[in-house]
Amino acid sequence: MDLTNSKLSSFNFKEKRVLLRVDFNIPIRDEEVLNDERMIRALPTIKYLLEKAKSLRIITHRGRPLESGEVQPEFSVKPIAKRLSQLLDIPVPIADSLDGLEQDKKIIMLENIRFFQGEKEKVKYKATQFNTLCVV
């Protein structure tokens, strides 16, 4: 898919850190992705942003973990990051905290956004936190 004529191409991503929220809530069994169709459909956008932006931060959720604010391994996005690494042929590290998104890496995936308190409460709350981390 060529994104040259898409709305994305109207933005100047050069030297900008971009935050991309994707729906990678996909079936996983025994730490293996069973269906990567959603990931494959997102690849053109991800590749475009990797090419144009300074860096890319990806957030997604997986399942409905308890609202304890604690990591629950059965809802981790690590298998998703592993599969995305294979699809992109580059490492996709996981950030276990918002501070981890500030690492100097081309691409980082945040651990399951639903592990973070406030995720379900108000979009504005999270948007404010991410505003300081990413420009777009």
Q: How would you describe each model-predicted region?
A:
Residues 1-136:
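Active-site loop-to-helix "anion-binding N-cap" substructures in soluble metabolic enzymes
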